[in-house]
Amino acid sequence: MKPKEVLEKWIDCFSKADAYHIAELYATNAVNHQVANDPIIGKESIYKMFVNEFATAKMVCMVENIFEDGEWAIMEWKDSLGLRGCGFFHVKDNKIVFQRGYWDKLSFLKQHNLPIE
């Protein structure tokens, strides 16, 4: 699969709040670094992160743009509450080996009435 195709599967799993299948898209030692948080290392830890996140807030990923460059897929997104962000996905052998996401954590917490850390 091309990186864009892996990202499209990721978006589908994210939209369904499917932590198991989204985690299956990551390599065993993958890193997911949402810059507002510490990096999450390893497929099992990434799975647990998504389980927790999907249980905490209803998240929506509305794609604005997807780009592909070599082993990278890049996405600009928004959600139904007006939050915007972008994600960078490094894909090797059909698995995400590194992901970095940029979004405004304070806005997210306020929109979902979550405690501000």
Describe the residue ranges of each PLM region.
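Generic alpha-helical secondary structure signal
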Residues: M1, E5, Y20, E44, ...
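Short, aromatic-enriched amphipathic alpha-helices that serve as compact interaction elements
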Residues: M1-A17, L25
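Short, flexible active-site loop motifs that bind/organize anionic cofactors or intermediates
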Residues: K9-D12, A36, F98
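A solvent-exposed, acidic/Ser-Thr-rich amphipathic alpha-helical stretch
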Residues: A19-D69
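A beta-strand edge to alpha-helix "cap/lid" segment located at domain peripheries
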Residues: Y47-E117
